[in-house]
Amino acid sequence: MHSFDVALLTDRRYTARHAAEGDWYLRNILDDDRLLQAALTRRGLTSVRADWADPEVDWSRFRCALFRSTWDYHERFAEFSAWLGRVERATRLCNPGPTVRWNGDKHYLADLAERGVPVVPSRFLERGSTRTLAEVLAETGWDEAVLKPCVSGGARHTYRVNRERAAESQSLLAALLARESMIVQPFQADIARTGEDTLVVFGGRYTHAVRKVAKPGDFRVQDDHGGKAHPYSPTDEQVELAEHVAAACHPVPVYGRIDMVRDNDGRLAVMELELIEPELWLRYHPPAAEAFAAGVVAFLAENS
């Protein structure tokens, strides 16, 4: 007998039921989760928030475990990977385990490119590689680039580098490659000028969008680094691309977020596809919570 239908997965930092005065970060998380929980309740589903890493949780009590704000997983990736294997034997994961494993490593961008999705060009440097940054930039012709881990979030170890000072950045790259695989991408000037547009999809269908803008003098649009997000009305071209990306996933995800920019040649290109624990800004467009809940109902019906 299941005690609850849905576990909304968070991490230990965000398990409080109420945000302290001035804690806008937790307040945003709770606002989004409450919108989703209310929509689930209207469809007859019970739900509770739970720390994914809590060893006391009996996951067999839930019909499914739904990823929401597990924002420390990339810092505990080995632990998280082992947890996935255990929990998917006890309950259903949403999005499913294979999708989570695929999307947890930025090598997925190469798969999307092979499936005809326009993505920002990427070069992968595997852990232990001795390739230099100067070699990569010379080979690609990129004057400026962004360096980040293949398994990451919140702009962890994300650096803007350039060809002129590549030698100075090499010790940093070497230290990172000693621990993990890295991705190098050309710096996209449109991020600094305009920002990054983020489109949300449920069951492959677009619902709403935001524009993320970096603070002056920075290129990182994450709120951890002073970035801001605002409601945004995307173009038809952007909506078409977002739904094309969702259709290129196998299976089509229950929920997802597609981050895109105008690349340095003026073409629309995907920066990231977030299928594990994306912030979805339901509070900016509450009807999206209804689409999300409907997707969870359909997921449970298909996987009962």
Residue ranges and their predicted role:
Residues F62-F67, T198-V201, R267-E279:
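A short beta-strand motif that forms the metal-chelation/ATP-contact edge
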Residues G116-A145:
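Rossmann-like NAD(P)H-binding beta-loop-alpha module
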Residues H2-A7:
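Extreme N-terminal starter segment of soluble prokaryotic enzymes
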Residues W71, A155, K215-P216, E274-Y284:
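Glycine-rich phosphate/pyrophosphate-binding beta-alpha loops
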Residues D236-S304:
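ATP-dependent carboxylate activation and anion-phosphoryl transfer catalytic cores
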Residues R156-H250:
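Phosphate-binding site of ATP-dependent enzymes
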Residues A53-F62, T132-T140, L173:
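Short amphipathic alpha-helix with an adjacent loop that forms part of the alpha/beta core around
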